[in-house]
Amino acid sequence: MSESETEQTGEHASHRTGQTHECRRCGRNQGLVGKYDIYLCRQCFREVARDMGFKKYR
């Protein structure tokens, strides 16, 4: 999609495809961890990852 198409339709690709996810804890749209349908921003994921069962190896 080119810039002219975005200007003509007035929407971004994420809105067209229905991918309007946001962080479940803080509502942030950027830096999302969407794997396994987690949908937490990376900052929130770091805070709760251990409680969710993820292990840090380094």
UniProtKB/Swiss-Prot annotation:
Region entry Disordered, spans: 1-21
Transmembrane stretches, start-end: none
Cofactor section: Zn(2+)
One GO cellular component term: cytosolic small ribosomal subunit
Free-text function comment from the UniProt entry: Binds 16S rRNA, required for the assembly of 30S particles.
Record note on quaternary structure: Part of the 30S ribosomal subunit.
PANTHER family in UniProt: 40S RIBOSOMAL PROTEIN S29
The name this protein goes by in its record: Small ribosomal subunit protein uS14
Organism whose genome encodes this protein: Haloquadratum walsbyi (strain DSM 16790 / HBSQ001)
